[in-house]
Amino acid sequence: MLKSLLVIAIGASLGAWLRWLLGMKLNALFPTIPPGTVVANMVGGYIIGLAIAFLAASPSLSPEWRLLIITGFCGGLTTFSTFSAETVALIQEGRLLWALGSISLHVVGSLAMTAAGLLSYQMIGTR
């Protein structure tokens, strides 16, 4: 149990640090729709897709790898709460089209990136 908690904490710390860095660097460039959150969710979706495929193909790996990568790192990197807060702020500002665009981009984009991660692993794995 302690080992599981430790790998989750390490992964979550690294993922949250990367999300913070993306927000600091990218949100200043385009504050209308904070791209740091979008990029964090897209990258996280892609990594989760890759990780799911890789871990499914590697059953001998320790279960802590799943906890480190998916639960920890991707859990710390991706952010539904920040996406929700940013979307509500857009609605409160009366920018409904921006809010709808943000919702579409996050949801469809994250799903597409997860599928792309799965497909990427399948393409690499068949070579």
Swiss-Prot record:
Q: How's its activity regulated?
A: Na(+) is not transported, but it plays an essential structural role and its presence is essential for fluoride channel function.
Question: Where is Na(+) annotated to bind?
Answer: 75, 78
One Gene Ontology term of the molecular function aspect? metal ion binding
Q: What UniProt keywords apply to this chain's record, in alphabetical order?
A: Cell inner membrane, Cell membrane, Ion channel, Ion transport, Membrane, Metal-binding, Plasmid, Sodium, Transmembrane, Transmembrane helix, Transport
Name any one Pfam family assigned in the record. Answer: CRCB
Its signal peptide is: none
Q: Where in the cell is it found?
A: Cell inner membrane
Could you provide one GO biological process annotation from this protein's UniProt record?
Answer: cellular detoxification of fluoride
Main location class: membrane
Question: Which NCBIfam families did the record assign?
Answer: crcB, PRK14196.1
- Which purpose does this protein serve, as stated in its record? Fluoride-specific ion channel. Important for reducing fluoride concentration in the cell, thus reducing its toxicity.
Cited PANTHER family = FLUORIDE EXPORT PROTEIN 1-RELATED
Q: Which HAMAP family does the annotation name?
A: FluC
- By what name is this protein known? Fluoride-specific ion channel FluC
Q: Which organism is it from?
A: Pseudomonas syringae pv. maculicola
